[in-house]
Amino acid sequence: MKKIEKRALLCLLLAAALLLGSGLFVFRFVKNGGRWVSFAANRHLYNRQGQLSVGQVLDRDGDVLSWTEEDGARRWYDNSTVRKATLHAVGDAQGNIGTGALVAFADQLSGYNLLTGAYSPLGAGNDLYLTLDARYNYIAYEALAGRKGAVGVYNYETGEVLCMVSAPAFDPLNPPSAEELEENDAYEGAYLNRFLSGTFPPGSVYKTVVLSAAIERMPDLFDRTWTCTGSTQVGDGAITCPHAHGEQDISSALANSCNGVFALLAGELGEDVLEEYTVRAGLTSSYRVSGLNTAAGSFDFDGLTANELGWAGVGQYNDLANPCALMVYMGPSQTAERRPCPGWCSRRRTPWACRPCPPCPGTPKSWWRGIPPPP
């Protein structure tokens, strides 16, 4: 009898484990099925060259940036500069750019759904509309003029990213060889989307963070004046400006982007206050942009000398911020309770209907409301 009881208990445990495992599999299947089916080894969706062979990528105006021919070969826009300007948004042929739509939104382009999988009796794949305007990307890429960097423009009221450019870039129809990528400095970081995944010294944009802290922590701020001679002694070194700004109040110091004044303010506010306001500004956070995580910024204020803190206060020293985070910080909505987070996937057109891309939950309304006028 005891043997029967033990065997029954063992059977119940095995049945429970089976149910638990099945439930876990079903949950993961529902959650990750689209990502599984869009794996590059799936020859139903990828051609022999490893290129996604279904779906079209279009900009906000309906200009087709990438599509596939009947034989499954992938094609790109017919202007080489536009191809370079939209490279990090659309993606390259081999899927080396992880932030490109051909990789990041492969499940949406494939037309995958729980009912029929990736098979569609009414067509091959979906049309994916981005919020980007290819013309804006073209203009921004031309303005970079071969320099390394990133350009981002968005509608802060809706969160739509209108322009997202990263350089250096290359023509996806004529990609550089592996040797060129390694040996030619012009292609350094070409696979990196600097707007989403890069960090840079914020420079003078960071002065707005210092100013916000000073407005709230220094009651006499708008009564103060400073005289800039082009070099201000802070601690054991000088904080320099490109030229002398003369006598200034806080408004003219901001307009002149005076390093000396903001270095002095940073020293007076101190490390802890600067760190608090930097965190509140979201510059150390990672944003989720259409399902992609941006790089988090880094600011180290611990144990700095007075001169180092002064340079940190003007966005130099060891300060690093993500371009997307800076863009979101500088574009708060003044009317909404929640500021929409940026996104660049607009909608996808399926054989059955046109559906919006999954929404972003948004981020809390910025604590920074701009610079109030002097009392």
Model-derived features with residue positions:
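Periplasmic/cell-envelope proteins involved in peptidoglycan metabolism and beta-lactam response
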Residues: 1-179, 190, 199, 224, ...
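Beta-lactam-recognizing serine transpeptidase/beta-lactamase-like catalytic domain environment
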Residues: 61, 157-204, 209-375
